[in-house]
Amino acid sequence: MTITISAVILAGGKARRMGGQDKGLQILGKQSLIEHVINRLQPQIHQISINTNRNQTEYAKFGFPVFSDELPDFQGPLSGMLTALEKTKSDFILFTPCDTPFFPMNLLDKLKSAVKNDRTLIAYACDEEREHPVFCLMSVQLKEKLRHYLASGERRLLQFMKENGGISVKFTQEEGNFENFNTLDDLKKTVI
């Protein structure tokens, strides 16, 4: 089974715990968080887009297509995912958040293997501690179900995935980690 895949970095949230600062544009070391994410994604996949609901001009400077949620009012990652699924020409989209710069370099390979081997429409990451559903490979075939799910008022990402046959794919600490940065203090405490 040959499938086409593109990637979308989700940077469309309000970042309330970061004092409203745009997470993806915050600096860790000498680069913004989104630059760290791009640097980890590029060896894995070439077709990358950025989903953001503000600072589009700043994000466009990274050289990738930028788009906003079609649904208003910052409705969470599923809103960005739905917009991406409606716009893509790919069979699947690899989603990553903009605030998690150390995710595994084999993220796409393992999620793609799970999709192919288990013939599922969604595979998402987990580690020894918990599930990380924003790191997922999702089929465009789910866009209608996702549209109806959001229209019903639901916003729970993991619930949507489980209701639609999503499977978790385990990653070890050695492969990378899913530590994200939610506050400016988190960034200040981290040395790279």
UniProtKB/Swiss-Prot annotation:
SUPFAM superfamilies in alphabetical order: Nucleotide-diphospho-sugar transferases
Keywords: Cytoplasm, GTP-binding, Magnesium, Metal-binding, Molybdenum cofactor biosynthesis, Nucleotide-binding, Transferase
Subcellular location: Cytoplasm
Chain sites annotated for binding GTP: 10-12, 23, 51, 69, 99
Residues making up the signal peptide according to the UniProt record: none
Subunit details: Monomer.
Function: Transfers a GMP moiety from GTP to Mo-molybdopterin (Mo-MPT) cofactor (Moco or molybdenum cofactor) to form Mo-molybdopterin guanine dinucleotide (Mo-MGD) cofactor.
Name this protein carries in UniProt: Molybdenum cofactor guanylyltransferase
Species this chain originates from: Haemophilus influenzae (strain 86-028NP)
